[in-house]
């Protein structure tokens, strides 16, 4: 199965910390969506947004165990949904991603999430906060 990652999971170190496995990712784009910072957090929420495009990473070869871990990691504010991802060169691939639920969208700020800022200012602390996540028995 495929995963379109757009937030902290675009970083291999986070993906490994959550799933305990390494996956090859490739750049991809999700049209008609936008990602905004969640209030009081350093990670984003993804919502539909006509005309906007989100840059991310497409991971392939994930199994059920990996998705169970990802479901837990993402938590109650997100729902896993199937989306059509632009994988480049005119190739569109069906992948799962995590959409911020309508009931929680009031928790999103007006600030678009920036991967470079997250990587330089927050990635290390984020990994420290979520270290040991993979011990969860699925």
Model-based region annotation:
Residues 1-138:
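Glycine-aromatic micro-motifs
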């Amino acid at each position: 199965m495929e995963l379109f990652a757009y937030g902290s999971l675009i970083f291999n170190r986070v993906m490994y910390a959550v799933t305990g496995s390494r996956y090859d990712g490739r750049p991809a784009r999700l049209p008609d969506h936008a990602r905004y910072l969640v209030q009081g957090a350093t990670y984003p929420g993804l919502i539909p947004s006509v005309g906007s495009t989100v840059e991310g990473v497409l991971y392939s070869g994930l199994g059920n165990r990996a998705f169970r871990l990802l479901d837990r990691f993402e938590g109650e504010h997100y729902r896993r949904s199937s989306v059509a991802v632009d994988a480049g060169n005119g190739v569109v691939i069906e992948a799962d991603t995590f959409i911020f639920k309508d009931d929680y969208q009031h928790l999103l700020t007006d600030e678009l999430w920036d991967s470079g800022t997250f990587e330089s200012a927050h990635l290390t602390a984020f990994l420290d906060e979520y270290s040991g996540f993979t011990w969860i028995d699925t």
